[in-house]
Amino acid sequence: MSVQGPQRRLLGSLNSTSPAAPRLGLAANQTGPRCLEVSVPDGLFLSLGLVSVVENVLVVAAIAKNRNLHSPMYYFICCLAVSDLLVSVSSVLETAVMLLLEAGTLAGRAAVVQQLDDVIDVLVCGAMVSSLCFLGAIAVDRYISIFYALRYHSIVTLPRAWRAISAIWVASVLSSTLFIAYYDHTAVLLCLVSFFVAMLVLMAVLYVHMLARACQHARGIARLHKRQRPVHQGLGLKGAATLTILLGIFFLCWGPFFLHLSLMVLCPRHPICGCVFKNFNLFLTLIICNSIVDPLIYAFRSQELRKTLQEVLLCSW
C-alpha cells in the first residue's frame, strides 16, 4: 500500500504498476538501458492468491480432521501450509486494500494507512521466513527418517516437534518485526539473503545425500536379483528427476526475490539493477506460485491425506 516504490521498502507496494499497463514491455529512460518489464495484472495476482488460500486451507483441514495424520511430519507440513496461507492472505489483502484506495472506494488517513501497511508487511515477511524454515524442517525430518529409521520415533518425538514449531514461529515473528523496522539497513537485507542461501544449501545437501542413499540401496537390491542396470538406473533417474523438480521449484520461486534484495545491497543505483527492481511484482507473484505448488509436492502426494481431503470436500457439499 505504500506508494514509495518496491525498491524503497523491504516488501513495498505489491502493485506499483498501473492496472492498465501491458503485461510485457520494454521500459527505457534517456540515460539508462532498455529494460524488460513484466507487469502482473492485479486480477491474475488476486486469482493466484485465492487458489493458494483454498489449497492450503484444505491441507490444514485434512490434517486436523484425520488423527492418523497427527504426527511430527504432518505437523511440519501443516505449518508449511499455514505459512503459505499467511503469505497468500496478506498479499491478497494488501493488494485489495491498495486497489480500493486508488479507486477512492476506501478512504483513510495517511497515518492509519501506513500503520496497516506496516502490519501487513510484518505478516508477509514473517510468513515468508516461517515458510522457508518449515521447508528446511521437512527436509531434516525426511533425512532422519531415512538415515536413522530405527531411532526415528525416539529422535523426532511430538514434544520436540512442538518445541521446534514454536521456536520457528517465535523467531519468524521477531525477525520479521526487526526486518520491517530496519528495512533500510544493509545488514537486514544481508541477513535475509544469507538465510535464503543457508536454507537452499541445507535442502540441497540433505536431499542429495538421501538420493545417494536410495541409489546405494537400489544397487544392493539389484545385486541380489541380478538386475543391476535397469533397477539402479530407473530409481536413479526417478530420484534425480524428483530432486531436480523439488530444488528447481524452490530456487525458481524464491531466487528472484532474494536476487532483488541482493542487488539492493550491491548496486541500488545502477541502471541495470534498476531493470531488475522494475519486476518486483513478478517476484512476489512467483512466491505466491510457490505457495500453490507446495501442497502438490509435500501434501497431496500422501494417499492418506488425499483420502481425508476427499472426505473434507464431500462433507462441505
From Swiss-Prot:
Covalent lipidation (S-palmitoyl cysteine), chain numbering: C315
Transmembrane segments: 38-63, 73-93, 119-140, 164-183, 192-211, 241-266, 280-300
Keyword Transmembrane in record: yes
Topology, Extracellular side: 1-37, 94-118, 184-191, 267-279
CDD domains membership: 7tmA_MC1R
GO-annotated cellular components: plasma membrane
List of glycosylated residues: N15, N29
Entry keyword set: Cell membrane, G-protein coupled receptor, Glycoprotein, Lipoprotein, Membrane, Palmitate, Receptor, Transducer, Transmembrane, Transmembrane helix
One Pfam family linked to the record: 7tm_1
Membrane topology: Multi-pass membrane protein
GO terms for MF: melanocyte-stimulating hormone receptor activity
Domain of life from the UniProt record: Eukaryota
Subcellular location field: Cell membrane
Cytoplasmic topological intervals: 64-72, 141-163, 212-240, 301-317
PANTHER family according to UniProt: G-PROTEIN COUPLED RECEPTOR
Family: Belongs to the G-protein coupled receptor 1 family.
Assembly notes: Interacts with MGRN1, but does not undergo MGRN1-mediated ubiquitination; this interaction competes with GNAS-binding and thus inhibits agonist-induced cAMP production. Interacts with OPN3; the interaction results in a decrease in MC1R-mediated cAMP signaling and ultimately a decrease in melanin production in melanocytes.
Its job: Receptor for MSH (alpha, beta and gamma) and ACTH. The activity of this receptor is mediated by G proteins which activate adenylate cyclase. Mediates melanogenesis, the production of eumelanin (black/brown) and phaeomelanin (red/yellow), via regulation of cAMP signaling in melanocytes.
Name of the protein described by the UniProt record: Melanocyte-stimulating hormone receptor
Species whose genome carries this gene: Panthera onca (Jaguar)
